[in-house]
C-alpha cells in the first residue's frame, strides 16, 4: 500500500506523538531508516532516541565504521540499552570511547570479533558505563589483564563476560576481575590457554553466584582446580571442560558432590574419565539435560545405564568416538524415561560396535530430532530406512562410502578412477 502526502499528514494529525513513537518502536533498523525518508515529521519520529534502545548491526558488519557508531551514540544517548557490533572489524577504540561517553545507560554490549579494540576500550567502558551487565569480548585478541582490572573497578554490576580466545589473559587478570565483579553469573574463557588452576581458585573465592563457566581448551587446568571451583560454586548449572585433557574422575566426583543443579556438562576429549566418575555424577545430578562426552574413550554401556536410571531430563547426548558403546547401552537409554520423553539429539559418530539393532531400540524415542551416525560401519541404509519409517521427523546424518567398481576380468583394460567414471 502506498500512502500519499495527505494520508501521511492525516496520520500525524489524528494520532498523538506518543502513540506514533510507540508504533515506531516495533520497527527494525532498516524499516526505521526507510520511514525517516518519508517526511520531516517521520524523520524526527523514526530517529527519536527512544526507538533505538536495542541495536544489532551484525547484518551490516562490513559497512560499519567508527563514525557510524559515533553517530548512533550521539542520536541514542541515554536511551540505548543494548548494542551488538559483532563482526564489525572496522570499529576501534576511539569510536567506542565516544560511544561510552554518550551511552552511559548501556547494559548489554557485544564486541565479538571487533579485533581492532584494545585495553583502551575497556578503560572507557569502566569509566563511563557503570550499568553494564553483559559484555562479549570474544576474539578481541589485544585485550590483556589490564582490561579486566579496569572492568572490575568500573563495571561492578557485570553478570556475563565472554573472554573466549583472548589468549593474553592470565590468572592475575581473572583475580582482578572476580574481586570487583562478584555478581558474575556467566564467565566464558574458551581458548584462554594461559589459565591454570589458580585462576579457578580465585573464581571459587569470589563468584558464589556463578551458574555458567566455559573452560574449553584451557589445557593447563587440572583436577585440583576443578575441585576447588566446585566447592565454591554450588549453583553451577553449565560447565564446559572440553579439551582439558588431564582431568580424571576426581573432577566428576567434585561435581557430583558439590553441584547438584548441574544441567550441562561438556567434557569432549577428556579421555581419562571413566564409568566410575559418570556413575557418581548421574546419581547426584538428576537435572542433567545436555552432555558432550565425545572421545571419552574409556566409557562403556555402564555410563548409559546410569544416565538412563538417574537423569530423566536428558535431551542431548554426544558419544562420538566412544568406541566401547554397544547396542545394549542404546537399549537402556531408549527404554528410559528420558529416552521416551526427552531425548532430542544423539551423536554416535565412530561408535564402531553400534549396529542396526541400536536403531530398532531408538524407535522408542518418539521425540528424537537428530541422529549422527557418521562412520558407524555396522549401520546400514536399510536399518536407517526402517527407523525413519517409525520416526519420519528425525534427521539422520550418515555417510556410506561409494561402492568401488569391480575389477575387470583378467585385470586387463584401462583403469579409471571413480571420478572419471562419474564424469
Swiss-Prot record:
SMART domains for the chain: FBOX, LRR_CC
Pathway(s) annotated for this protein in UniProt: Protein modification; protein ubiquitination
A Gene Ontology biological process term: regulation of autophagy
Taxonomic source organism: Bos taurus
GO cellular component: membrane; SCF ubiquitin ligase complex
UniProt protein name: F-box/LRR-repeat protein 2
Subcellular location: Membrane
Gene: FBXL2
Modification after translation: Phosphorylated by GSK-beta (GSK3B), promoting recognition by FBXO3, leading to its ubiquitination by the SCF(FBXO3) complex.
Residue stretches of each LRR repeat: 61-87, 88-113, 114-139, 140-165, 166-191, 192-217, 218-243, 244-269, 270-295, 296-321, 322-350, 351-375, 376-401
UniProt crosslink position (Glycyl lysine isopeptide (Lys-Gly) (interchain with G-Cter in ubiquitin)): 201
Assembly with partners or alone: Part of the SCF (SKP1-CUL1-F-box) E3 ubiquitin-protein ligase complex SCF(FBXL2) composed of CUL1, SKP1, RBX1 and FBXL2. Interacts with calmodulin; may antagonize substrate ubiquitination by SCF(FBXL2). May interact with PIK3R1. Interacts with PTPN13.
